[in-house]
A protein has these predicted regions:
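Bacterial N-terminal signal peptides that target proteins for export
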Residues: 4-27
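Hydrophobic helical h-region of N-terminal Sec-dependent signal peptides
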Residues: 28, 32-33
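Subset-of-secretome marker
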Residues: 41-258
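C-terminal motif of bacterial Sec signal peptides marking the signal peptidase cleavage site
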Residues: 36-39
Length: 258
């Protein structure tokens, strides 16, 4: 049986496109993550009185709220130029849907493109310092092989990522109240490179980025983020959705026995 590393290497050397490998065995657990995010929408009742529509009020409230998060469901999607998650630039990140419990527990379903022509899905689980990745052929979980930077806990870091990102925003403008999975405050500002690297799990590096945020008017929680990145003229577009704050997910290590 090929290891997860050798299976990915074999897929990189595969020619031809259009094939999506099915998830099997333990990875099917993570496939359930995807169906819930689509059902997460807004509602007309905000649950309280909205805060003042002023960046001077919204930003401190959002920074405090995001720094206090204990669990969240996320969906991060990339369009445009590919962004790679392996050291040989063969495994391009397309999308991740997952759940995070702070501290140190997360699971995610990753859509990736191998060698530019083969679409597949990988399950990733992180639990108290250990990370496992699903074998793309068997679907069974195995310890994360060397050379792959896929730790799903990095997709959401409240204290080390989100709070300082919001506190460090520059040139912030308030763009109005919009319907974005419910009524949300829309702000735009420039995020510093160091903090953006943290909140994108190191997928975006070495550049300050203009970011659009949608913030819940009562809780201050960020529910959507959009931005573009430019790597020597190759532009990637990013969309992040956040939902189910405070839910209990009961994330556990994968069953390595299948």
């Amino acid at each position: 049986m090929p290891s997860v590393g050798s299976a990915l290497v074999a897929m990189v050397s595969t020619k031809g496109g259009g094939l999506r490998r099915p998830l099997t065995s333990g990875a099917l657990i993570l496939a359930l993550i995807g169906g819930v995010m689509a059902a997460c929408g807004g509602d007309d009742d905000l649950g309280g009185d909205p805060m003042a529509a002023d960046p001077a009020v919204i930003l401190p409230a959002a920074a405090e709220a995001m720094g206090s998060v204990e669990s969240v469901r996320f969906e991060l999607e990339r369009g445009g130029a590919p962004v790679f998650i392996d050291e040989v630039d063969s495994l391009a990140f397309d999308k991740a849907i997952g759940r995070v419990e702070v501290p140190g527990r997360a699971d995610a379903l990753l859509d990736v493109t191998v060698n530019g022509n083969l679409a597949t899905q990988l399950g990733a689980v992180a639990f108290d310092g250990d990370t496992w990745l699903s074998n793309p052929i068997t679907g069974d979980f195995e310890p994360l092989p060397a050379g792959y930077d896929i730790d799903p806990t990095l997709f959401f870091d409240p204290k080390g990522g989100w709070q300082p990102l919001i506190e460090g925003l520059q040139d912030v403008t308030f763009l109005g109240t919009e319907d974005k999975d419910g009524q949300r405050y829309h702000l735009r500002g420039t995020g510093p490179a160091d903090q953006l690297e943290v909140v994108t799990a190191r997928l975006v590096r070495n550049q300050d980025v203009v970011i659009d945020f949608w913030v819940h008017p009562v809780t201050g929680l960020v529910t959507a983020v959009e931005f573009d990145t430019d790597d020597d003229g190759a532009v990637s577009s990013w969309s992040l959705r956040l939902a189910d704050y405070g839910e209990r997910f009961d994330i556990e290590p994968p069953d390595l026995d299948g």
